A protein has these predicted regions:
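Conserved catalytic SET/PR domain of SAM-dependent protein methyltransferases, capturing the structural core
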Residues: 1-128
Length: 128
């Protein structure tokens, strides 16, 4: 499937979170917000043996020994334990972000970094 750079969202400042992804229009539940390519890296290149790198803040698990960086807005969606969107792998090197409920224009689009929308797995930062 082709990659989609979304016209439904934009990146702007998110209160207490740095940047975030926000809806430019109402988005209906089930809508694919964007389909993006991912850059796949060996786990050791992201985390190495030294201190945590800035790159690690944007990477997510891609199988047992790999990490991925999502292109497009993919690495800019903020985490929420009550997300309005989800992400999932779409082929060997693509990621999809889709609405799991209706999202209002101007609302921040968030995902659960665990990959499961209802998961309560702890994250390594304070959730705003």
């Amino acid at each position: 499937m082709p990659h989609i750079q979304s016209t439904l969202v934009e990146v702007k400042r998110a209160q207490g979170k740095g940047r975030g992804v926000f809806a430019l229009a109402d988005i209906k539940k089930g809508t694919i917000i964007e389909r993006v390519p991912v850059v796949i890296l060996p786990l050791r290149e992201v985390f190495g043996s030294g201190p945590r790198t800035r790159l690690a803040e944007y990477a997510f698990a891609w199988g047992p020994d790999k990490m991925a960086i999502a292109c497009g807005y993919g690495s800019l969606y903020n985490h929420s334990y009550t997300p309005n969107a989800r992400f999932y792998a779409d082929g060997p090197a693509s990621q999809v972000f889709a609405a799991i409920r209706n999202i209002r224009s101007g609302e921040e689009v968030t995902v659960n970094y665990d990959g499961r929308p209802r998961a309560k797995s702890p994250v390594t930062f304070e959730v705003a």
